[in-house]
From Swiss-Prot:
This is Shikimate dehydrogenase (NADP(+)). NADP(+) binds at G126, A127, G128, G129, A130, N149, R150, T151, F152, L153, K154, M213, G238. Homodimer. Its EC number is 1.1.1.25. Shikimate binds at S14, K15, S16, T61, N86, D102, Y215. It comes from Haemophilus influenzae (strain PittGG). Belongs to the shikimate dehydrogenase family. GO terms for cellular component: cytosol.
Length: 268
């Protein structure tokens, strides 16, 4: 039986084994998919041993996406630009191929919500690792992006890296252009840490739809709670993105594209 896993630290909270096994059942693929706790000091040795023992592929979650990318021999364009991967596949020649399905997972979920049309204005809050993985697929979907970050320089550097691929501009959190936004995407992990919003409420009120790349089971994320408290509508957490990126990883490994919406509906 072909072996796959998700690697992270911590990992006990991961929904990936549940999701991937549902995708396998739906597509009549026989696989074993497990969760593996990565050692912060010995992750590289663990991962290489995992593949040497015959594993076919894996997902990578926090905090190992950049380190896993460094171990790969070949890369997709979206992994290369993100300098991080969430998916590794062992090729027939034994080489490791890195992909990043986070962004295409986000785009696929925005399509499910009917929130994705060409030439929209999208505001992304946060310029960290989560954002790096999603910018290329959003730009390829012809979205016009304002990338806002507390540290302007970080947003500026990221925007400049992706400018050859579409329309993207940087802003600091307190200088976001006052214009309407078709979608506001929260890519900050902090949410409302310390009770402070990632962005001024008046900016949020310029949005039409609100997407949090985070999700918490059974309760609202801080960003979603903030949106609701402002009376905003068209709000979604990132669980659909999680299922969709898993489906795209599965497709890379198995050559079969699952119906991610059916699995999302089962698990939500």
């Amino acid at each position: 039986m072909d072996l796959y896993a998700v690697w992270g630290n911590p990992i006990v909270q991961s929904k990936s084994p549940l999701i991937q096994n549902k995708l396998a059942t739906q597509t009549h693929q026989t696989i074993e998919y497990i969760a593996k706790l990565g050692d912060l000091d010995a992750f590289e040795q663990q991962l290489l041993a995992f593949f040497e023992e015959g594993a076919k592929g894996c997902n990578i979650t926090s905090p190992f996406k950049e380190r896993a990318y460094q171990l790969a021999d070949e890369y997709s364009q979206r992994a290369k630009l993100a300098e991080a991967c969430n998916t590794l596949k062992k090729l027939d020649d034994g080489k490791l191929y890195a992909d990043n399905t986070d962004g295409i997972g986000l785009v696929t979920d925005l399509e499910r919500l009917n929130w994705l049309r060409p030439n929209q204005r999208v505001l992304i809050l946060g310029a960290g690792g989560a954002t790096k993985g999603v910018l290329l697929p959003l730009l390829q979907a012809q979205q016009n992006i304002v990338l806002a970050n507390r540290t302007f320089l970080k947003a500026k550097e990221l925007a400049e890296r992706f400018q050859p691929y579409g329309n993207i501009q940087a802003a600091s959190m307190d200088s976001i252009p006052l214009q309407t936004y078709d979608v506001v995407i929260n890519a900050t992990s902090a949410g409302l840490s310390g009770g402070t919003a990632p962005v001024d409420a008046e900016i949020l009120k310029l949005g039409s739809a609100f997407y949090d790349m985070q999700y918490t089971k059974g309760t609202d994320t801080p960003f979603i709670a903030l949106c609701k408290s402002l009376g905003l509508t068209n709000i979604s957490d990132g669980f659909g993105m999680l299922v969709a990126q898993a489906a795209h990883s599965f497709h890379l490994w198995r050559g079969v594209m699952p119906n991610f919406v059916a699995v999302y509906e089962q698990l939500k």
